């Protein structure tokens, strides 16, 4: 069969998680390639990027079902860099998910489901 070995879907070496390439076709745009991720992370990052008013375009794609990576394209206004927008989106997501976890734990405490 032509499928890659199963371990390739999760084994990642040092420095291989993300690569950033400038998009030469569009001004103020970058392509972020994130290895060993899928639609779950791509969709949530894209949604967070689109909340930023200085982001003109944000989209993602999975090149092929057997390739375990996503490519996120970000275009911003002239006074804002795509890398800055991406970093801000990730930071905001981390804080939102931390708040969600905190609220979830608070709700479960009366039920004594958590230690």
UniProtKB/Swiss-Prot annotation:
Belongs to the archaeal Rpo11/eukaryotic RPB11/RPC19 RNA polymerase subunit family. Keywords: DNA-directed RNA polymerase, Nucleus, Transcription. InterPro entries: RBP11 (IPR037685), RBP11-like (IPR036603), RBP11-like_dimer (IPR009025), RNA_pol_Rpb11_13-16kDa_CS (IPR008193), Rpo11-like (IPR022905). DNA-dependent RNA polymerase catalyzes the transcription of DNA into RNA using the four ribonucleoside triphosphates as substrates. Component of RNA polymerase II which synthesizes mRNA precursors and many functional non-coding RNAs. Pol II is the central component of the basal RNA polymerase II transcription machinery. It is composed of mobile elements that move relative to each other. RPB11 is part of the core element with the central large cleft. This is DNA-directed RNA polymerase II subunit RPB11-b1. One of its GO terms (cellular component) is RNA polymerase II, core complex. The lineage of its organism: Eukaryota, Metazoa, Chordata, Craniata, Vertebrata. One of its GO terms (biological process) is transcription by RNA polymerase II. Ubiquitously expressed. It holds the Pfam family RNA_pol_L_2. GO terms for molecular function: DNA binding; DNA-directed RNA polymerase activity; protein dimerization activity. The keyword Magnesium does not apply. The keyword Ribosomal protein does not apply. It is found in: Nucleus.
């Amino acid at each position: 069969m032509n499928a890659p070995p199963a371990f390739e879907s999760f084994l990642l070496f040092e420095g291989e998680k993300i690569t950033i390439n400038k998009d030469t076709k569009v001004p103020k745009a970058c392509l972020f390639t994130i290895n060993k991720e899928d639609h779950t992370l791509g969709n949530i990052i894209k949604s967070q990027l689109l909340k930023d008013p200085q982001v003109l375009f944000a989209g993602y794609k999975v090149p092929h079902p057997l390739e375990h990576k996503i490519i996120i394209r970000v275009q911003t206004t002239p006074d804002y860099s795509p890398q800055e927008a991406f970093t801000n989106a990730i930071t905001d997501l981390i804080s939102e998910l931390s708040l969600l976890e905190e609220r979830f734990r608070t709700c479960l405490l009366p039920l004594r489901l958590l230690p």
